[in-house]
C-alpha cells in the first residue's frame, strides 16, 4: 500500500511522506518511460527503500496500474528474449518474456530522493550486491515488473524474496523455470475470480511463475462482484486478512429493507 500513497498518475518525482514500517526509509523513486499509447510520457511506478536497522536489506516496490484492462486491449502478447538473465540452465534455451512488459522494464529510471541522481536500469543492476537481501513486490502491472526485476537481481547472485499480487504471466516456461532457480523465496498471490493472472495464457506459450497462493474474494460477501474489484489491490489485501483496508468502491452495498 505504500506505493499507492505516492501514486499520482503521470508524476515523475512524487513528493510527500510515505508510511513505511519501522526504520525503513525511501531511497529512490522509480519512473518508467511510456512505450505504449495509454501511458503518459513518464510515469511514477514505485520506489526503493532501505532498512536503517539492517542496511543489508533493501526493498523495491512497484504499484499497480489503473489501466490494466487498457493493457489487455493494447498489448500484442508477443514473446521476446530477456537479456538480463541469460539462458535457462535446465534446457539451455534463451528465456523469453512479454515484449511490452520488457520494454517498460528496460525504461525504468531510479532517482535518488536526496541528491536527484538518476540511474538507468543497467546502472542499478550493476550495483546489486550478493551481500544484500532484496525484497521485491508489486501489484498488477507492478507485479509483472517485480517478477522481471526479481529474476534480474537474483541472476546477479543476490538473495531475493518476491511478493506479487494479481500479476499477469510475464514469460514462457523457460522464464518460469529460471525464475524458480533465481528467486529463492517467492509468493505469487492470485485471487481465484481475477482474470488478469490467467493472461496471456498457455496457448500463447506463457507460463505462471511458481509458488502460487490462491485466495478467493468470492467467499467475502462484502466485496463487490465485478472484474475490476476481483483485480483491485484492496480486495486482495482484505481477503488476506487486512482489517485496516478500506474496500471503498469495491464494497458491496447492502439493500435497505
Question: Where are these predicted regions, by residue range?
Answer:
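Short, polar loop/linker segments at the starts of domains and inter-domain junctions
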Residues: 14-23, 63, 75-77, 203-209
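Secretory-pathway lumenal glyco-enzymes, predominantly type II signal-anchor Golgi glycosyltransferases
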Residues: 6, 34, 43-48, 205-212
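Lipolytic serine-hydrolase domain surface
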Residues: 172-257
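A conserved cap/lid and substrate-binding interface adjacent to the catalytic center
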Residues: 27-137, 154-160, 257
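Serine-dependent carboxylesterase/thioesterase catalytic core
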Residues: 120-206
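Charged, compositionally biased non-catalytic regions
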Residues: 1-25
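Short, solvent-exposed loop/turn elements at domain surfaces
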Residues: 10, 68-70, 197
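Intrinsic-disorder-associated interaction segments
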Residues: 13, 94-97, 114, 216, ...
Amino acid at each position: 500500500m505504500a506505493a499507492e500513497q505516492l501514486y499520482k498518475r503521470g508524476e515523475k518525482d512524487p513528493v510527500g511522506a510515505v508510511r513505511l514500517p519501522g526504520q525503513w526509509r525511501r531511497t529512490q523513486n522509480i519512473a518508467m518511460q511510456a512505450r505504449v499509447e495509454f501511458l503518459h510520457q513518464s510515469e511514477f511506478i514505485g520506489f526503493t527503500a532501505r532498512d536503517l536497522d539492517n542496511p543489508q536489506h533493501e526493498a523495491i516496490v512497484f504499484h499497480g496500474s489503473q489501466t490494466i484492462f487498457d493493457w489487455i486491449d493494447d498489448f500484442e502478447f508477443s514473446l521476446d528474449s530477456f537479456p538480463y538473465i541469460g539462458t535457462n540452465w535446465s534446457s539451455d534455451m534463451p528465456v523469453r518474456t512479454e515484449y511490452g512488459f520488457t520494454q517498460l522494464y528496460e525504461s525504468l529510471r531510479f532517482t535518488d530522493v536526496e541528491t536527484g541522481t538518476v540511474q538507468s536500469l543497467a546502472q542499478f543492476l550493476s550495483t546489486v550486491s550478493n551481500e544484500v537481501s532484496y525484497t521485491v513486490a508489486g501489484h498488477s502491472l507492478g507485479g509483472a515488473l517485480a517478477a522481471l526485476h526479481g529474476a534480474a537481481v537474483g541472476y546477479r547472485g543476490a538473495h531475493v524474496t518476491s511478493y506479487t499480487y494479481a500479476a499477469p504471466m510475464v514469460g514462457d516456461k523457460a522464464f518460469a523455470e529460471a525464475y524458480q532457480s533465481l528467486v529463492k523465496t517467492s509468493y505469487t498471490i492470485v485471487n481465484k475470480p481475477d482474470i488478469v493472472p490467467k493472461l496471456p495464457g498457455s496457448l500463447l506459450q506463457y507460463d505462471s511463475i511458481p509458488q502460487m497462493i490462491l485466495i478467493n474474494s468470492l467467499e467475502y460477501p462484502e466485496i463487490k462482484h465485478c472484474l475490476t474489484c476481483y483485480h483491485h489491490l484492496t480486495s486482495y489485501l482484505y481477503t488476506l486478512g487486512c482489517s485496516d483496508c478500506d474496500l471503498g468502491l469495491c464494497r458491496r452495498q447492502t439493500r435497505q429493507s
